[in-house]
Each structure stands twice: as structure tokens, then as C-alpha cells.
A protein has these predicted regions:
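Active-site segments of SGNH/GDSL-like serine hydrolases
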Residues: 35-42, 48, 66-101
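His/Asp/Glu-enriched short active-site or ligand-binding loop at hydrolase and phosphoryl-transfer sites
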Residues: 108-116
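Histidine-centered active-site loop/cap adjacent to the catalytic His
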Residues: 119-140
Length: 140
């Protein structure tokens, strides 16, 4: 999950994107690809509201404020990296729309994936190939 809320309301603060994001910029990447929101949607994590500053620890338990926190970090720390946010198909509308709005606010490229083959809401092997094809076409 992007946020600290996982399946069945479990605390995922030890493995959420907001915890792991600090490891991504260690190697000065040319491109950062974020594929987030799938588990937040399927786990019924709280969606929350877009929040562009003043985050609290309780905000990190909702998807959209956590997404904004993460995008703020990446755009501030990885200024020379191309950042692309992949949004899975078939997510809750409020998550898709919120992440899209957050990307627009932070100037992050956003790819809305289409017709991805899935198993239990996650891309199958065929779906991963479809994602690769869509991302390759997007960054050309």
C-alpha cells in the first residue's frame, strides 16, 4: 500500500510506500516508476483527501495524503529523475482521480493503464507484459 493501512485494517507502516520510498533515491536514478494504489484500493484503505503540506502521522494511514507526501519527497529529492506514476485499471474511482490530481499538482507524469490482464486484482504474467508495452510506448 501507499499508505500505512493494509488488508483487514492491519498496520503496514513497516512496508508502506511511505516507508520504502527513501530507499529509491539512494542510487540517483534516471527514472522512478511508481506503481501504487492497487493494494490501497483492494484493501479498502481509507482514501482521505489530497493534502499538499502539513502531513501528520495519522494522515499516513490514508491513501491520498500519503500519495502527496510521497510525491512531494520524490519531486524534491530526485529533481533530475523522470518520475512516472502507473495507475492500475479497475481501482476505486476516488483513488484513480485523486492520484491523477496529485500527479498533476506535482508535475509527475501519470500513465493510466488500460485492459491489464489480472489475477486477484494484480497483473498476471500477461498483464506485466501489457504494462511493459504501455510504459514503453508512454516514455517514447
Amino acid at each position: 500500500t501507499i499508505c500505512n493501512t493494509g488488508y483487514d485494517g492491519a498496520d503496514y507502516s513497516d512496508r508502506a510506500f511511505t516507508k520504502r520510498m527513501f530507499n529509491v533515491t539512494a542510487g540517483d536514478p534516471d527514472m522512478i516508476v511508481i506503481f501504487g494504489g492497487t493494494n490501497d484500493s483492494w484493501a479498502n484503505a481509507p482514501v482521505g483527501e489530497l493534502k499538499f503540506n502539513g502531513w501528520t502521522s495519522s494522515d499516513m494511514y490514508s491513501c491520498l495524503p500519503s500519495c502527496c507526501f510521497m510525491l512531494e519527497y520524490f519531486t524534491a529529492v530526485a529533481k533530475d529523475s523522470q518520475i512516472v506514476f502507473l495507475i492500475n485499471s479497475e481501482l476505486k474511482d476516488e483513488i484513480t482521480e485523486g492520484i491523477t490530481a496529485a500527479c498533476r499538482h506535482y508535475g509527475v507524469q501519470c500513465l493510466l493503464l488500460k485492459d491489464i490482464d489480472k489475477i486477484w486484482g494484480h497483473p498476471s504474467i500477461k498483464g506485466m507484459a501489457q504494462i511493459s508495452d504501455q510504459l514503453t510506448e508512454f516514455i517514447k
